[in-house]
Amino acid sequence: MQIIHTIRELRAWRKNAGKVAFVPTMGNLHEGHLALVREAKKRADNVVVSIFVNRLQFGQGEDFDKYPRTLQQDADKLEAEGVAVVFAPDEKELYPNVEQRYSVEPPNLQNELCGKFRPGHFLGVATVVSKLFNIVAPDVACFGKKDYQQLAVIKGLTEDLNFDVEIVPVDTGRAEDGLALSSRNQYLSAAERDEAPRLYRELKAVAESLAQGSLDYAGLEKRAVQSLTEYGWVVDYVEIRRADTLEVARAGDKKLVVLAAARLGTTRLIDNLEIKLP
């Protein structure tokens, strides 16, 4: 396995790499990331994993400075999975002209759901993913469904900007108690970790009500928020949306997703659950 730090070197490698699958990450890899890598391996001759903590997608007061940088441990895990290349550029490599930086702005979704609470986040995501697609030139790229809104943004930019990349969604990895795997879970105290699976349980409760025919979307959302709040969560949102577009769900929609973001202590957790109605 190679660890490549420059765009020029990666492009030289890419010329003879055959079909390439790509998994972009910020490092600090866990089993959820490795599931993306395993899916990528099924779909290509070679897998490239990028590791880059992207300052653009962190807001003021967020955890950019304390986000764990664990390149050597990550590289060891990826080598064991048979990854061909780890692309680990520094900030100057990806953003050499900070004062003249062009960006990619998602038109519809960046101010809703997580975008409402993290201004500029999805602009940062869309910009770095566009740059990485141009650099890596993958045939396939794998993204986890845990970041459901991010996945929707990436599907949109891939289509609108004519990237010749197949986007492969991968199911959310979970701990045995249902908590979605996330690099930020390590910020949780022991007591918070015990409480954290409640977020997924509330999503399942909403999904069960929808499956039983409830059309009181606002009521279901409100009850989930109240329940989480009673247990000490600070809730950004619980919302039921159309799964394919993330538009506000309407009666008669069959493919839905319930999404949530909430803080437990100082840690912001997100999760979602897809629902297909008969």
From Swiss-Prot:
Pathway: Cofactor biosynthesis; (R)-pantothenate biosynthesis; (R)-pantothenate from (R)-pantoate and beta-alanine: step 1/1. It comes from Neisseria meningitidis serogroup C / serotype 2a (strain ATCC 700532 / DSM 15464 / FAM18). Its EC number is 6.3.2.1. GO terms for cellular component: cytosol. Pfam families: Pantoate_ligase. Gene3D superfamilies: HUPs, Pantoate-beta-alanine ligase, C-terminal domain. Belongs to the pantothenate synthetase family. The gene is panC. ATP binds at residues 26-33, 144-147, 173, 181-184. Homodimer. It is found in: Cytoplasm. Its main location: cytoplasm. This is Pantothenate synthetase. Keywords: ATP-binding, Cytoplasm, Ligase, Nucleotide-binding, Pantothenate biosynthesis. The active site is at 33 (proton donor). InterPro entries: Cyt_trans-like, Pantoate_ligase, Pantoate_ligase_C, Rossmann-like_a/b/a_fold. Signal peptide: none annotated. GO terms for biological process: pantothenate biosynthetic process. PANTHER family: CYTIDYLATE KINASE/PANTOATE-BETA-ALANINE LIGASE, PANTOATE--BETA-ALANINE LIGASE.
